[in-house]
Amino acid sequence: MPTKIPRNDYAAMYGPTTGDRVRLADTDLIIEVERDLTTYGEEVKFGGGKVIRDGMGQSQVTRAQCAVDTVITNALIVDHSGIYKADVGLKDGRIHKIGKAGNPDTQPNVDIIIGPGTEAIAGEGRILTAGGFDAHIHFICPQQIEDSLHSGITTMLGGGTGPAHGTLATTCTPGPWHIGRMLQSLDAFPMNFGLSCKGNASQPEALVEMVSAGACAMKLHEDWGTTPGAIDCCLSVADEMDVQVMIHTDTLNESGFVENTLAAIGDRTIHAFHTEGAGGGHAPDIMKVVGYENILPSSTNPTMPYTVNTLEEHLDMLMVCHHLDKSIPEDVAFAESRIRKETIAAEDILHDMGAFSVMASDSQAMGRVGEVIIRTWQTADKMKKQRGRLAEETGDNDNARVMRYIAKYTINPALVHGMSREIGSIEEGKRADLVLWSPAFFGVKPEMSLIGGTIVMAQMGDPNASIPTPQPVYSRPMFGAFGRAVERSAVLFVSEAAQAAGIGDQLGLAKDTLAVKSTRDIRKSDMIHNSFRPDIHVDPETYDVRANGELLTCEPATDLPLAQRYFMY
């Protein structure tokens, strides 16, 4: 007969349920469970004396009869689509079903069948998110990949060939030969990848050649000459070949001002990198592009959030990244023109308003590859403390703000780059690129990461201990990060032209290749929870930023969550 148990006891046993609230790490962000897809009294849980046993929560159904490969039980899902509790069934490396797991022979309402061939991951008291997507990578060194993976990222997009000086400054893998070598190298790592080629050319032939060789995007960078002619040529090729274009505009305004760049772009879709400007772009008013429907604005993480240390560290970073010389006054003036506290402060607020749509790193080129997720949540926390609740919030929680910020490094970059049918959210049919977090470590240190349904990284104690938990516990690569499992779990994103030409066979790639699609009809209004288009004015003398006439300014943070408390060693 049914019985009731205290809510605290239930949460301790099966995780939080509808109406329960959870704090995210040491931030002031509180989420509330909106709904629970499991069935009270019929929850499945693995362990001695628990439910997932033969004839109880485990059925006799074979894999061929639709039992799942893996079940994640009682997970608290935090996604752009909502904050809710469910069991998640994985099969063939994809999310098979989100709902209620168990044995249909003994339990009601079961839509995820647990069989003898099903592995169990305990999601009770854990948060489940889609793997993060960092869409601004300088492939300067392969060690970045490990740092990124261990922070909760499962997909990286960018360009480069290693520590060549072109790569140190620009996210471009130039030419078919380099693209081929990089794709062959990236075959070896437990991470999904896409490469961007150089987009700076005034004639289309070389750009077509690079996209056909496997690049899934093109990058226009001022260090290669982002002139109106190059912008027009690059976008014309992109429209023809269905790949995205990322742009780093002309800081010095040598070949034109922001208005000239906007005229060259026209109404064509483009992904605007570090749209605040410290990372590069028309000084001082590149930020005005956030108001355009065809421009998809992103930030890189060194300016996020604005703190008392932000300005001081940026000048030296910029000199190194762009191969500048402190003994040349013009180089110093170039660097100083990009670092403006007024626009950096406004960037925080525009993210909170949903005007900036994407967060990325700019790895080792004025950005930290392992801090995309950390800095996203630090910004959300800073904005809650400084600006209060969002008008969109309902109830005593921060669900709307949390969904806005998680979209910035999951679904929105996937939409921008034509990958959203495969990655970016927890949806049935998408790849099982998933990250499990303890709420106390949310945003800082993932408990476990899966790519294509295979565990590639997890917190693990001393391997020589009698149990997995003795210290030192830290994130370590798991079986999915080794051998042939890497090849079958992660993928390489390429252009449709390269996919049709059989680029995988041409280069002898072991990973599957997937073509990006529908990159040219994405608009700002498609950016989930981040589609606000204010009219931006930047004062050319004071650098004050106004959105729809409202002055945007905030104080720099003097301390942040998700910081030294979590990194004592």
From Swiss-Prot:
This is Urease subunit alpha. The keyword Transport does not apply. GO terms for biological process: urea catabolic process. One of its GO terms (cellular component) is cytoplasm. Ni(2+) 2 binds at K219, H248, H274. It comes from Jannaschia sp. (strain CCS1). InterPro entries: Amidohydro-rel, Metal-dep_hydrolase_composite, Metal_Hydrolase, Urease_alpha_N_dom, Urease_alpha_subunit, Urease_AS, Urease_asu, Urease_asu_c. The gene is ureC. It catalyses: urea + 2 H2O + H(+) = hydrogencarbonate + 2 NH4(+). Ni(2+) 1 binds at H136, H138, K219, D362. GO terms for molecular function: nickel cation binding; urease activity. The modification N6-carboxylysine is found at K219. Pathway: Nitrogen metabolism; urea degradation; CO(2) and NH(3) from urea (urease route): step 1/1. The keyword Cytoplasm applies. Pfam families: Amidohydro_1 (PF01979), Urease_alpha (PF00449). Keywords: Cytoplasm, Hydrolase, Metal-binding, Nickel. The active site is at H322 (proton donor). Heterotrimer of UreA (gamma), UreB (beta) and UreC (alpha) subunits. Three heterotrimers associate to form the active enzyme. Carboxylation allows a single lysine to coordinate two nickel ions. Binds 2 nickel ions per subunit.
